[in-house]
Amino acid sequence: MFVDNVDIYVSSGKGGAGAVSFRREKYVIQGGPDGGDGGKGGDLYFEVNANTDTLSKFKGAKHYRAKNGQPGMGRRMSGKSGEEMVIVVPPGTQVFDYESNELLLDLKEEGMRVKFLEGGKGGLGNYHFKNSVNQRPTYAQPGIAGEERHVRLELKLIADVGLVGFPNVGKSTLISTLSNARPEVANYEFTTLIPALGVVDVDEFSSFVMADIPGIIGGASEGKGLGLEFLRHIERTKTLLFVIDLSNYREPLEQFEILQKELSQFSPELSLRPFGIALSKVDALSKEEANEKIELFLKGIGLSSCQSNQYALSEALQNYIAPLESSIPAFVVPISSATHENIKPLKYLLHESVRRRG
């Protein structure tokens, strides 16, 4: 089960109490104080591990506690420190204060380990309280309480390219064609119910990560459909790929305008992200019908086709490739995942877009 939002309580350990103890040795009638200090409470850490990609294990387990420190002992022996608690999360996990919604940690990188809560200090044993007035103190410090917080964990997947489109426009088929991802693919809306990540191999030494999220529909910003709930998973991407269905009953320009509107209402910053456009399911139309729709779409967004063959694009279909200094949109390319038309050029175009943005 994919879970990307949970709230939990986290606590560091309490320090152990100092000991009240006196020397008890043969021939020592009234031994002095020898109570040891309590052990330190365990610290609580967050650690990033790429072997997990969901927060599902936190469902139902509400409280994570480090161990308390052990009490001190006689002969000035300190108590054992409490065992630390390490909470393992996937890359892209953010930790928020549950009440204030303040961002406390942004855990992006594999192997990252952050101390979040400090364990309480152990109390001092009665040995420390001996003085000229009080030779046999019967007081020792209690341990200091650990820290506790109520936090919300939110997962934002880390990908280079984010797919954006209406339901059933071919996003899942595209990511499974380009990458190692295997999302469910079917000819009905909302087949994709959870985000999917796929690694796209460009050549022996180059690759990038692509993220697919459930389709967005008009009114998503008011809570309709599923896509808006998962838009956070493409917030970290370097570039977006709008997937527009040429065979859809909605005209391509209408699809694009609705998607842009919903993105801007979710996040103005995301709506300004560099992007490319893939006009999908071109195999469902004749070349004449497809070119007519492509030309109409390009005109609608203020562009004209350039019939570029720089990336070995199909010569039978119109396209648009932006000059190097331009970034929005970087390209408009008709594709077919069924026949693989322009799929390899699309891979190179996306890789170039990612490479330009570091």
From Swiss-Prot:
Binding site residues for Mg(2+): S172, T192
Protein name listed in UniProt: GTPase Obg
Domain OBG-type G: 159-355
Residues reported in the UniProt entry to bind GTP: 165-172, 190-194, 212-215, 280-283, 336-338
Principal location listed in the UniProt entry: cytoplasm
Needed cofactors: Mg(2+)
CC annotations in GO: cytoplasm
Gene behind this protein: obg
Gene Ontology biological process terms from the UniProt entry: ribosome biogenesis
Keywords, sorted A to Z: Cytoplasm, GTP-binding, Hydrolase, Magnesium, Metal-binding, Nucleotide-binding
